Amino acid sequence: AADKAATEMARQGVALAAGDPDKRLEHLLRASDEMRATFLTMEARLVEWVGLFLPEVRFGKDRSSLPKLVGEADSLATLADKLSVSMPDNGPSKSEWKTLREWGESTATFRGKLDRLENAIRELSESHLPSLSIMLGPLLAARLCVEAHGRMRLARLPAGTVQVLGAEKAFFNHLKTGAAPPKHGHIFMHPWISRSPRWVRGKIARTIAAKASIAAKVDAFEGEPWSQSMVDEIDQKIESIK
């Protein structure tokens, strides 16, 4: 009887966890981080590999089209033509090209999986964290929620803590060595901070953290979700700081 009761309690616990948006966001976000790390490794390998045979290619920051181009090319000559570069004197063997092409296909497939995973995060975040999502974007909102271990815990954090969520290593280094304390954590990812002059980032981070803390409370206590006009007001305030 005790075993049966324990099994039933465990089953109910799993069922409750499956219905918990905080837990679901955590799994989605961790999976996304792991998948992105793998994708970036695969993409970097592909860029180096193609560059070995086609040294004239200059990818710059935009590499997004390369995996698909490689995967669809039936030969190195076809790829060189698509990239508008000349063919080298020494090219890969048929088996080597096949392997390179398959790597391109796999990288493109991985990119598609990552996009679908991030779309799932956006969808859940916009439902679970509507005000924070419209303010910071659903991916950053989800990251702050997961870092705080849940929507309610995020809502209860002071703005100063929200400001440095994700900068724990830098904060502990500050305590240990006396180095300068971090001015921001994950919220640095938002263009409001990352695209602002360095000397005003701390002030902007404090403003954003204060507003994000309020948005988190609205979401946690299921108040009226913020509108775009409210976000526009924040944007105007930040512009006045710069």
Enumerate the language-model features and the residues they cover.
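Phosphate- and other anionic-substrate recognition elements at nucleic-acid/protein interfaces
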Residues: A1-K61, D74
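Non-transmembrane, amphipathic alpha-helical segments
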Residues: R24-E34, T38, P92-S95, T99-E102, ...
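Generic structural signal for well-ordered, non-transmembrane alpha-helical segments
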Residues: D33, A37-L40, A44, G71-D74, ...
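Long, charge-rich alpha-helical interaction segments
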Residues: D74-P88
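Helix-hairpin-helix/helix-loop-helix acidic hairpins
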Residues: V85-L139
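Basic (Lys/Arg-enriched) interaction patch that binds polyanionic ligands
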Residues: R122, E126, P130-V162
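Phosphate-backbone recognition surface of nucleic-acid-processing proteins
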Residues: V146-A220
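Acidic, carboxylate-rich catalytic segments that either coordinate divalent cations
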Residues: I204-K242
